[in-house]
Design a protein with these regions (language model features):
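Short beta-strand-centered aromatic/proline hotspots
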Residues: 169
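Non-catalytic connector elements of ABC transporters
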Residues: 164, 174-284
Length: 284
């Protein structure tokens, strides 16, 4: 009656019905005659590439196939709106990536407006035309994936957009469009010594203000010895295939995640610098 369909996290397929009957269930509830329903079911099945599986039961399908059945059931009624509630959370990483591409393709082919709920940054960026970030029931920011990725409005949105490092400190100096931050966990007094410096892109902050600098791991680089920056002691290094990512700790105990080009040894002393254009500064 409301003109929208929903795809659930747990698929919610009828286990005793064939794939075809699951897809056509909404049409039967709407009283669509069989002669009209048949071609629409065929179209939806073809759209999700399951025409050859229509006589099977859901239990005979893989998780990805079951999810596609749920999507076909949602679009077969030709709704004006489709709501997808974390539909990929039960799938493994490889299948999630494949299904993201399938959902995008199906969305473009069906033309239905789709609201997709997710806690996954990659899903949001790859699927959305516009992203709405919400926290505690309130809208934090609305924009295109590029707008939110490059300029999150606050630390909450920055966290969702992959700014894994969020380090407190005070503004020490301004250099054109950038500021230098003295990083320190306890910023009670401007005269307190800091454990290192990072340069970032500020908003409307003044010298001496308490701030938080947010930076993604791959926007931190290892500096040559003697260069200014943020000193860390290496705790561990992970090999990620395309490179390495390390966890370091500052002299005042803050953890710092950063990219590197080799396997680092625990206890190794390094100095890190941030790309000023990619490190964002927020009020504390």
């Amino acid at each position: 009656e409301r003109g929208f369909s929903m795809v659930f996290q747990n698929y919610a397929l009828f286990p005793h019905m064939t794939v075809r009957n699951n897809v056509g269930f909404g049409l039967r509830m709407q009283g669509v005659p069989a002669a009209q329903a048949g071609p629409r079911i065929d179209k939806a099945m073809a759209m999700v590439r399951l025409s050859d599986q229509q006589d099977k039961l859901p239990g005979q399908l893989s998780g990805g196939q079951q999810q596609r059945v749920a999507i076909a059931r949602a679009i077969v009624t030709e709704p004006t709106l489709v709501l997808m509630d974390e539909p990929l959370s039960n799938l493994d990483a490889k299948l999630r990536q494949e299904m993201r591409q399938e959902i995008r393709r199906i969305h473009l082919q069906s033309g239905a407006t789709t609201v997709y709920v997710t806690h996954d940054q990659e899903e949001a960026l790859s699927l959305a035309d516009r992203i709405v970030v919400m926290r505690d029931g309130r809208v934090q920011q609305v924009g295109t994936p590029g707008e939110l990725f490059d300029a999150p409005i606050d630390l909450g949105v920055a966290d969702f957009m992959g700014f894994r490092n969020r380090l407190p400190g005070r503004i020490l100096a301004r250099n054109g469009a950038a500021v230098t931050i003295g990083v320190r966990a306890d910023t009670a007094s401007p005269s307190d010594p800091h454990c290192g410096e990072l340069t970032g892109r500020p908003r409307q902050d003044s010298l001496g203000d308490k701030v938080v600098i947010a930076v993604r791991p791959y926007d931190l680089t290892v500096q040559a010895s003697g260069r200014p920056g943020l000193g860390v002691t290496v705790e561990l290094t992970e090999y990620l295939g395309r490179g390495y990512q390390a966890l370091g700790r500052t002299s005042d105990g803050q953890s710092v995640h950063f990219a590197c080009d080799r396997l680092l040894s625990p206890g190794e002393q390094l100095v890190l610098a941030a790309d000023p254009a990619r490190a964002l500064v927020y009020p504390a």
